[in-house]
């Protein structure tokens, strides 16, 4: 049984009750959204995961990517990133490790959080294939599905799988060449496999078998966008749209089998094209939850891509995206460090909150009202409690204090609020 099959059968699960309470919504309404495939609750039956709802009519959620690389392996560092994710309000974590003992790293990450955990299994497949055969492109079907099954048994809650990379998609790429080609790592693994062997993508060819594996453990399938644009010039091209059409067809198959599914979206999109991209996805994929990376709205800001992504993420979420994958200041430059994780997470949470306010979500507006009330009362402790990051503003206030405890050091005796407040008391 999955959350979706239960919902279709009219069963309200404990996870549905928890999410409905968190979202401030009627549980029957939530159940119906899950039954239709408009909402997912990524929760592997083998793990005691905190239930998190992703999809329409819910708050916008934020994911944190972390993980090792071939150039830097430090489990303690990754666990610190997990700690930061837990502390500053991430809704999910993805382990994208490609260096070191991948199963051991994943085990430690899972052990140190109750947030939903996602992976990209093709990374481990590629690493194993290179170690075993000498090349990533020599991976075989058995290796692919063995890794997926093993990760499902370990408790992974959602998996990014690039099932929409097909021979037809690769042809679309070849017939309409891009500036940046394929920038998705998992997408590149499978594109290279198809081009070298002239074989169909096993994840597409054996999609029914894949669904059996995922359904057994109620792993949510996150359909990866292997043809996402890697620069603004490549946005919304034929390869991207061809893959999206395929993903829409696969969403139908998932729903027929009762497998929870969401769809991943583009990374580099000009601001004026974001709304159209969201509407195309929601139409083609029939309102499946949409999970976007950014989108990044300019390629000119390495070192500041948490900002470019937050700008794009706000509009994306207002226009239909349900799940924002954070982007850190280190994007396009190096592996993220602990401070990068915090900066990226807070930036993405700002985008999510701004979008939820624009969409009129009651919880988002409740928080805004509480902040205004705290500011009117000059209640600095309460302001910092409500803030998305309480530590930074508290430290900043301590660095240059005001003589007046109610004011801040920008205005001091000339505080606008205090001046009018004093006059009102006369």
Swiss-Prot record:
Residues noted as binding Zn(2+) in the record, renumbered to the chain: 268, 332
Transmembrane segments: none
Cofactor: record remark: Binds 1 [4Fe-4S] cluster per subunit. The cluster is coordinated with 3 cysteines and an exchangeable S-adenosyl-L-methionine.
Cofactors (names): [4Fe-4S] cluster
Keyword Zinc: yes
Positions of substrate binding: 65, 94, 123, 162, 184-186, 225-228, 264, 291
Coiled-coil segments on the chain, per record: none
Database matches in InterPro entries: ThiC, ThiC/Bza_core_dom, ThiC/BzaA/B
Residues annotated for [4Fe-4S] cluster binding in this entry: 408, 411, 415
GO biological process: thiamine biosynthetic process; thiamine diphosphate biosynthetic process
The reaction(s) this protein catalyses: 5-amino-1-(5-phospho-beta-D-ribosyl)imidazole + S-adenosyl-L-methionine = 4-amino-2-methyl-5-(phosphooxymethyl)pyrimidine + CO + 5'-deoxyadenosine + formate + L-methionine + 3 H(+)
Biological or metabolic pathway of the protein: Cofactor biosynthesis; thiamine diphosphate biosynthesis
GO molecular function: 4 iron, 4 sulfur cluster binding; carbon-carbon lyase activity; zinc ion binding
Keyword set includes Metal-binding: yes
The EC number(s) this enzyme carries: 4.1.99.17
One Pfam family per UniProt: ThiC_Rad_SAM
Top-level taxon of the source organism: Archaea
Key words, A-Z: 4Fe-4S, Iron, Iron-sulfur, Lyase, Metal-binding, S-adenosyl-L-methionine, Thiamine biosynthesis, Zinc
Entry-linked HAMAP family: ThiC
Family affiliation: Belongs to the ThiC family.
Protein's job: Catalyzes the synthesis of the hydroxymethylpyrimidine phosphate (HMP-P) moiety of thiamine from aminoimidazole ribotide (AIR) in a radical S-adenosyl-L-methionine (SAM)-dependent reaction.
Protein name: Phosphomethylpyrimidine synthase
UniProt source species: Methanococcus maripaludis (strain C7 / ATCC BAA-1331)
Gene responsible for this protein: thiC
